[in-house]
């Protein structure tokens, strides 16, 4: 039993794993904060002795701060997001994107998938003598197009199926 088995690890120097370098160390990215400006040369600080030998404070000189040019200027842009408008089978009030006026939409009914499906269903039921065309006369079975009354632009469509 003195021979080590294949499942035993060979004894040797153990190496402790170290933490990987940080992102800044790896990529060489500086911090996002600008470096402070270099100090301006000014008067020496300390006490100045007067003629009577007593210490007095030096006169204070104020220098105006020098603006640091920012190479990474941030431009602010305001974005207006308009919610999508849901069209239904009745007129809606909205601002027309073409003429930019507040309008109430005009409706136009067109044969759509539900109209043709209803016609085919009536035809299969035996309404061949013209009764199968009734869905083309019923607005509740047709698709609805919304138009601007001012510029006549198509604003949207409500599809029933």
UniProtKB/Swiss-Prot annotation:
Keyword Protein transport: no
Matches recorded under PANTHER family: LIPOPOLYSACCHARIDE-INDUCED TUMOR NECROSIS FACTOR-ALPHA FACTOR
Organism: Rattus norvegicus
Assembly mode: Monomer. Interacts with NEDD4. Interacts (via PSAP motif) with TSG101, a component of the ESCRT-I complex (endosomal sorting complex required for transport I). Interacts with WWOX. Interacts with STAM, a component of the ESCRT-0 complex; the interaction is direct. Identified in a complex with STAM and HGS; within this complex, interacts directly with STAM, but not with HGS. Interacts with STAT6.
Primary localization: cytoplasm
Name of protein: Lipopolysaccharide-induced tumor necrosis factor-alpha factor homolog
Family under the similarity heading: Belongs to the CDIP1/LITAF family.
PROSITE patterns linked to this entry: LITAF
Single GO MF annotation: RNA polymerase II cis-regulatory region sequence-specific DNA binding
Sequence ranges assigned to domain LITAF in this UniProt record: 76-160
Posttranslational mods: Phosphorylated on tyrosine residues in response to EGF.
Residue ranges, annotated region (Membrane-binding amphipathic helix): 111-134
Up-regulation conditions: By estrogen in vagina, cervix, uterus and kidney.
InterPro entries hit by this protein: LITAF, LITAF_fam
GO biological process entries: cellular response to lipopolysaccharide; negative regulation of non-canonical NF-kappaB signal transduction; positive regulation of canonical NF-kappaB signal transduction; positive regulation of transcription by RNA polymerase II; regulation of cytokine production; regulation of macrophage cytokine production; response to lipopolysaccharide
Role according to the record: Plays a role in endosomal protein trafficking and in targeting proteins for lysosomal degradation. Plays a role in targeting endocytosed EGFR and ERGG3 for lysosomal degradation, and thereby helps down-regulate downstream signaling cascades. Helps recruit the ESCRT complex components TSG101, HGS and STAM to cytoplasmic membranes. Probably plays a role in regulating protein degradation via its interaction with NEDD4. May also contribute to the regulation of gene expression in the nucleus.
Motif (PPxY motif): 20-23
Cell membrane listed as a keyword: yes
Listed GO CC annotations: cytoplasmic side of early endosome membrane; cytoplasmic side of late endosome membrane; cytoplasmic side of lysosomal membrane; cytoplasmic side of plasma membrane; extracellular region; Golgi apparatus; Golgi membrane; lysosomal membrane
Entry comment, domain topic: The PPxY motif mediates interaction with WWOX and NEDD4. The LITAF domain is stabilized by a bound zinc ion. The LITAF domain contains an amphipathic helix that mediates interaction with lipid membranes. It interacts specifically with phosphatidylethanolamine lipid headgroups, but not with phosphoglycerol, phosphocholine, phosphoserine or inositolhexakisphosphate.
